[in-house]
Design a protein with these regions (language model features):
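Charged, amphipathic alpha-helical segments characteristic of ABC-type P-loop ATPases involved
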Residues: 1-20
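An N-terminal hydrophobic leader/cap segment in hydrolases
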Residues: 16-33, 82-123
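Long amphipathic alpha-helical segments
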Residues: 16-86
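N-terminal cap/lid segment of alpha/beta-hydrolase-fold proteins
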Residues: 48-50, 54-57, 100-143
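Short, glycine- and charge-enriched coil/turn segments that flank and shape catalytic ligand pockets
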Residues: 67-69, 141-144
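Short acidic, glycine/serine/threonine-rich loops at helix termini
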Residues: 135, 147, 162
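Short beta-strand element of the alpha/beta-hydrolase
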Residues: 138, 144-154
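The serine-hydrolase catalytic nucleophile loop
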Residues: 155-162
Length: 162
């Protein structure tokens, strides 16, 4: 299996999913197995393949958590989150699957944070009369003031991806 499609956008998004392996957000075998299920240029098959993979890995995470294997559960939740994000990518803005798929990505990411034991807090950032969701990552659970970096993605990224 080659890690590309004739369609450059499909290839880019496939490589994007594979690149998360560097931080534990994907496994190359899962990415290749998913890509094998995708029909060239077919957005529905893209969504279906990634959504099926995300659901399977989320179930694996749930099983690991039930067995008290928190590290394995957290790793699987992180991969599921990224696979749900990949599943959502090509959906039209008015596609009813978009909201549930995006919610799957966020929910599994939150479960990853819980299982991982990282010092992360979900926050709301005040901006121009509204608030924006965000995450505050701390090096430890002390209240010691430290420099803060605000990272913002583009239109096609998610807060969980950063």
């Amino acid at each position: 299996m080659k890690l590309r499609f004739a369609d450059q956008t499909f290839s880019f998004e496939l490589l994007r999913a594979a690149s998360y392996g560097l931080s534990g957000g994907s496994e190359i075998g899962e990415v290749l197995a998913t890509a094998k299920q995708i029909q060239e240029g077919d957005f529905d098959s893209w969504h279906r393949a990634w959504h099926d993979t995300a659901s399977r890995i989320e179930a694996l995470a749930e099983h690991s958590l039930h067995q008290k294997h928190c590290l394995s559960a957290g790793q699987a939740y992180l991969r599921a989150s990224n696979y749900y994000r990949a599943a959502e990518f090509f959906l039209a803005p008015d596609d009813p699957r978009r909201n549930t798929t995006s919610e799957g990505s966020r929910t599994t990411f939150w479960k990853f944070l819980e299982a991982s034991g990282l010092c992360v807090e979900r926050v709301r950032i005040t901006y121009e009369g509204t608030t924006l969701p965000g995450y505050l990552y701390r090096v430890d659970d002390s209240e010691m003031p430290r420099p803060t970096l605000l990272s913002v993605g583009g239109f096609d990224s998610t807060g969980e991806e950063l």
